[in-house]
Design a protein with these regions (language model features):
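Short Fe-S-cluster ligation motifs
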Residues: 121-135
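Non-globular targeting/processing and membrane-anchoring segments
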Residues: 17-75, 165-170
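Thiol-based oxidoreductase modules, predominantly thioredoxin-like and allied folds used
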Residues: 81-87, 110-124
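Bacterial Sec-dependent N-terminal signal peptides
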Residues: 1-23
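Non-catalytic, surface beta->alpha helical segment in thiol-disulfide oxidoreductase systems
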Residues: 136, 141-170
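Short, surface-exposed basic-aromatic patches at helix termini and helix-loop junctions that form
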Residues: 101-107, 130-134
Length: 170
């Protein structure tokens, strides 16, 4: 009986969270589907828009800077990332696949990544988005021990991996 209670206590939140993952809404401006709320990469394939094809194309062609990647790999320990993005956003279509490419090459644990897709008002009901003070997307927020280290807002100032390295060097 204790085992059943223990498994229920562990599995129920995971099931509840997964049911709210990759929710869809209609983008009123373009009348397209968009993701809203907590999402993951699998959600990109589920919406009726060009986000997934743009994502796949950008992911495929992006080449990381190897010297920077070596430095960055040493700085990822204990890092969590929150990504606020929008599937309707051109900058998200460009920078989110590059971010995933960087993290994939570094074998980043994607359980330490929270992705929130917002609408055109930068809102995502049922998420922490309102408390993050995000005005532009994508916004990449980097944390270590629940302390925000820095953000990349909309477009990096240099190569994305270089900006991440600078933030994680703090």
């Amino acid at each position: 009986m204790k085992i059943i209670f223990f498994l229920t206590a562990i599995m129920l939140p995971a099931i509840a969270f997964s049911q709210n993952l990759n929710q869809k809404a209609t983008d009123q401006k373009k009348n397209n589907e968009m993701l809203i709320g907590y999402c993951n990469r699998d959600g990109f394939k589920t919406i009726d828009s060009n986000f997934d094809s743009a994502y796949l194309a950008e992911y495929k062609v992006y080449r990381t800077d190897l010297a920077t990647m070596k430095l960055l790999s040493q700085k990822l320990k204990g890092v969590n990332v929150t990504l606020v993005m929008a599937t309707w956003c051109g900058d998200s279509k460009e920078w989110v696949p590059r971010f995933y490419k960087i993290m994939d090459e570094l074998n980043f644990n994607h359980k330490k990544l929270t992705v929130i897709c917002v609408d055109r008002e930068k809102k995502a009901p049922g998420t922490i988005a309102a408390g993050l003070n995000v005005d532009k997307v994508p916004t990449f927020i980097f944390y270590r021990k629940k302390t925000e280290l820095g953000r990349i807002i909309e477009v990096p100032s240099d190569l994305l991996e270089k900006d991440i390295t600078v933030i994680l060097s703090k």
